[in-house]
Amino acid sequence: MQYTTALVNTKKTALVVGGNAPACFDDKYLSDKDNLYFYLTFQNPLNPNKQISIFTPEFDVALEYNTYPDCKLLLVEHELSSQSKSDRYKHPEIDEIYSIYEMSTEKDMPEKNCAIKFGGNVMPIQWGLDNDGKVVKDGNSFIFQINEICMKDISVFMAGCIYVYGKIEGNKATNPFVAYWEYS
């Protein structure tokens, strides 16, 4: 099931990659088991009053657990928040890169090299793995993907893609989570 991509504002959006996490995480403990590092944040185009942030564990853990249902990347949807002064979740391998990226929907692809693609069909990097089929079989729907290859000077996931799924009810996407990630 797919939601109407017409609801997605595909204008350019600020995407903060690296640096300090949003301030709303200053007093939150995100994991009992893994060290988590802030990867990126952006305003949710499906709900402009919310922000989406993604955290990643150490690379070897992320690589070992990169598929559904065991993916260790953490997506948190939260209230709008400015950048923290605390470096508690700062990723040790990336400096802050603040950029303006275009979002796209299925009709724009593949002509546009957009950092974030909302709706439509999954565009896998690693053909033949059927990661999408496993997630959909459990009643989840594709919401968006983050294309790291379209982000200048960023390669935390080996120029890969992060795939986000959730529940689709009418034109609302709820309970988003990172289902898996692939690398090129």
Predicted segments — roles?
Residues 1-184:
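Preference for intrinsically disordered or flexible, low-complexity segments
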